[in-house]
Design a protein with these regions (language model features):
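Short, leucine-enriched amphipathic alpha-helices that occur as contiguous helical runs
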Residues: 24, 28-36
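Helix-turn-helix
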Residues: 30, 38-80
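Conserved phosphoryl-transfer catalytic core
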Residues: 81, 85-93
Length: 238
């Protein structure tokens, strides 16, 4: 008779073998994560496929197997998360429009536009923060501008529509300049330059997205209201 001792462990069941498709998807995700990190630190021109391969620990030939060239890899890195944040913003703006019962306010529209995105950088982990820093670099490049236009113009125009309805008497150019200042502030925030950390002697931190979320929409809404006050337009907030 065999006695099973308390210290004996039952035999572990063999793990099911991963399919070729699963292994391929895992490899691609590792490559995209590594490329995202490197692009966020050095930009597209400061990174080679060899750099990405070394960070992942694979041969460069595997990079060429999955991606035609560095440009194709960069586009894949950008679009992986761009589709997510675009869908979330559109959903948030649509939900706000339903909730406001046809009476949007500037601050309400800005909260829907900004907070939904900032939440990803608060709770989405370092990958989202790396992608945000990458996004902060794109507007100064031709390839980046094309990607931003493709993915985010519909979101921006959705916000512009709500702002027009919140301030129907505001000059069209003021609405677009207001948006320009909003997105410029957001892109600088996503870049996480660390400059505010130094200037404030550590009082503020450029990666404190919760602090940004608590302030940005209110601050920008005040700017729109100042435009309205000087032009004679009136926000639906009164």
């Amino acid at each position: 008779m065999t006695i099973l001792m308390a210290t004996d462990k039952p035999a572990e069941r063999p793990q099911p073998k991963r399919s070729r498709k699963e292994r391929r998807e895992d490899s691609i995700e590792q490559i995209l994560d590594a490329a995202e990190y490197l692009f966020s630190k050095h930009g597209i021109y400061g990174v080679t496929l060899k750099d990405v391969a070394q960070r992942v620990g694979v041969h460069t030939s595997l990079m060429h197997y999955y991606f035609a060239d560095k440009q194709a890899l960069f586009v894949e890195v950008f679009e992986r998360r761009a589709t997510v944040t675009r869908a979330r913003r559109i959903e948030a703006l649509d939900a706000y429009e339903r909730a406001c019962d046809g009476r949007p306010t500037v601050e309400g529209a800005l909260h829907a536009f900004l907070d939904t995105d900032l939440d990803l950088y608060i709770s989405g982990g370092e990958g989202w923060r790396n992608w945000g820093a990458l996004g902060g670099q794109l507007s100064n490049t031709d390839y980046g501008a094309e990607l931003m236009d493709k993915h985010f113009d519909p979101v921006v125009m959705r916000l512009i529509d709500l702002l027009r309805r919140a301030m129907p008497d505001m000059a069209e150019e003021d609405i677009f300049w207001g948006y320009h200042f909003v997105t410029g502030s957001l892109l600088l925030t996503l870049a996480r330059t660390g400059r505010i950390d130094k200037l404030s002697n550590g009082l503020c931190h450029s990666d404190d997205f919760e602090a940004v979320k608590a302030r940005m929409a209110r601050f920008m809404a005040a700017g729109f209201r100042e435009f309205a006050a000087t032009s004679g337009a009136k926000d639906s907030e009164g």
